[in-house]
Amino acid sequence: MLVTEETLLGKSLDELTQWVEKQGQPTYRGKQLHQWLYEKGARSLDEISVFPKTWREKLINYPIGRSTIDYRTVAPDATRKYLLCLGDGLIIETVGIPTAKRLTVCVSSQVGCPMACDFCATGKGGYQRHLRAHEIVDQVLTVQEDFQRRVSHVVFMGMGEPLLNLEEVVKSVKILNQDIGIGQRSLTISTVGLPQKIIQLAHHHLQVTLAVSLHASNQPLRETLIPSAQHYTLKNLLADCREYVNITGRRISFEYVLLGGVNDLPEQAIELANLLKGFQSHVNLIPYNPIDEADYQRPNQTQIQTFVQVLEQHKIAVSVRYSRGLEANAACGQLRASQR
């Protein structure tokens, strides 16, 4: 389900030019509108001071497509979590993650998530609808505006399964790249894996990074953690991943949330290494971030390092990603569209 109200945000320069011409305005107004939407982050047409006042007054209620910040919190590590209110009143979460040289935005692609992964707060809260491309782009503009600095990287790792909303996600990638100026190689699309969808994404020939959430080294455990895995075996998922690499020439990142005593045993690391043998890939290990809705535990440092060492011994490229924003419930797996 999508909200279908026409908005200006999400339109290309050509589309905006056509729109202003239909309004009886000269062609160059399209370029001005594009600049105010994507460079200046205009929230209403009334802000666009280069437009004639009489035209601005006529269009004062025309929807641009910007959200409003319903709630904002800052973690001790400077990560900022936002609850954004969409045009229809639904709430999504977005996270801004700053470092000295980067500003990364973790964007949502759906309101909620239907995948119901057992360790993830978003999946526990149910699913309402897909986001439109402009609602994804708006998240980046909102964070950019709040930090008063340019966003350098975007990860589709917020609420939702991006490949279920593939058309709008791909459209948003093109807008972020062509209209806002973020390089495609600075964009990451995450997925738990869906039949046919990885290959469909590959045929768009984007230069983004694909991050595949494995979270288990064998099929029975993966089905326990990710219910949708019942319809997509590890064998078929990895076959599609290999085909993705062949089509795009891009290395895949495999995400693996470490759950203490569940999927972090040395023999499971060996099993994972055997799965990925000969793969053009990198493994990101993510120590579990606790949520109230699940009883899993974060492994200790010894368990984490042992898992890393086993993978390295088997020639698997691996790193540990400690999530930012943990204290603000803004870390990986904690997004639930609520203030807690």
Swiss-Prot record:
Binds 1 [4Fe-4S] cluster. The cluster is coordinated with 3 cysteines and an exchangeable S-adenosyl-L-methionine. This is Probable dual-specificity RNA methyltransferase RlmN. It comes from the Bacteria. It holds the Pfam family RlmN_N. Its EC number is 2.1.1.192. One of its GO terms (cellular component) is cytoplasm. The lineage of its organism: Bacteria, Bacillati, Cyanobacteriota, Cyanophyceae, Oscillatoriophycideae. Reaction proceeds by a ping-pong mechanism involving intermediate methylation of a conserved cysteine residue. Gene3D superfamilies: 1.10.150.530, Aldolase class I (3.20.20.70). It catalyses: adenosine(2503) in 23S rRNA + 2 reduced [2Fe-2S]-[ferredoxin] + 2 S-adenosyl-L-methionine = 2-methyladenosine(2503) in 23S rRNA + 5'-deoxyadenosine + L-methionine + 2 oxidized [2Fe-2S]-[ferredoxin] + S-adenosyl-L-homocysteine; adenosine(37) in tRNA + 2 reduced [2Fe-2S]-[ferredoxin] + 2 S-adenosyl-L-methionine = 2-methyladenosine(37) in tRNA + 5'-deoxyadenosine + L-methionine + 2 oxidized [2Fe-2S]-[ferredoxin] + S-adenosyl-L-homocysteine. InterPro entries: Aldolase_TIM, Methyltransferase_A, RlmN_N, RNA_MTrfase_RlmN, rRNA_lsu_MTrfase_RlmN/Cfr, rSAM. The active site is at E93, C332. GO terms for molecular function: 4 iron, 4 sulfur cluster binding; metal ion binding; rRNA (adenine(2503)-C2-)-methyltransferase activity; rRNA binding; tRNA (adenine(37)-C2)-methyltransferase activity; tRNA binding. It is found in: Cytoplasm. It is an enzyme of class 2 (transferase). NCBIfam families: rRNA_mod_RlmN. [4Fe-4S] cluster binds at C113, C117, C120. The keyword Aminoacyl-tRNA synthetase does not apply. S-adenosyl-L-methionine binds at G160, E161, S190, S213, L214, H215, N289. It comes from Rippkaea orientalis (strain PCC 8801 / RF-1). Belongs to the radical SAM superfamily. RlmN family. Keywords: 4Fe-4S, Cytoplasm, Disulfide bond, Iron, Iron-sulfur, Metal-binding, Methyltransferase, rRNA processing, S-adenosyl-L-methionine, Transferase, tRNA processing. PANTHER family: 23S RRNA METHYLTRANSFERASE, RADICAL SAM CORE DOMAIN-CONTAINING PROTEIN.
